[in-house]
Amino acid sequence: LAQADRAGNLNVSRFGSRLAGAGGFINISQNAKKVVFAGTFVAGNLQVDVADEKLKIISDGDRPKFIDAVDQITFSGAVGAQSGRTILYVTERCVFRLSKKGLMLVEIAPGINLQKDILEKMKFTPLMAEKLLMMDARIFRPEAMGLKEDLLTLPIAERFTYQPEENLFFVNFEGLSIRSIEQIDEIREHVERICR
């Protein structure tokens, strides 16, 4: 994440007069079902610390990455927005989501001042989510985040899909382990509700 602009365009290939090239970046970012760009919010001498589940900026970078227009478009925000995919821009202090109208600020790190640490460090004003969320507090703790459960577990309610126009009922039991009568009852309730 070298540069991003209000439209969600991203430059990861050109740094001043130096052309680094995009490698497989374009193929991956254009074909992934969900795209998460990650990098620091600013460049140059950034020093941060995490204490008491909050992010503290010790020394802020002196080169903004969120600018009016990127020097070179390696990822097109307009094309990405039209694709309907989830596209996120994650930094140490905030998270943006690409919308059809451009970059939208959706999350902020605990300990960060919206005006001083984010908006004043950008060369444009981003769209703002109706409700600005706090980034997951687990990020700012020293222990492991416990992502296995989040990433690999599909809740029972999300394992059933009914398509009424074709009268098709899909059930996804991939990776499911039944360990209790309560789980069986929950499955029965969902199936009965959908099939009524």
Sequence positions of predicted segments:
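A structural preference for short, pocket-lining loop segments at secondary-structure junctions
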Residues: 194-196
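Conserved phosphate- and dinucleotide-binding cores of soluble alpha/beta proteins
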Residues: 1-143
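STAS-typified acidic loop motif
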Residues: 156-192
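Long, compositionally biased
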Residues: 146-153
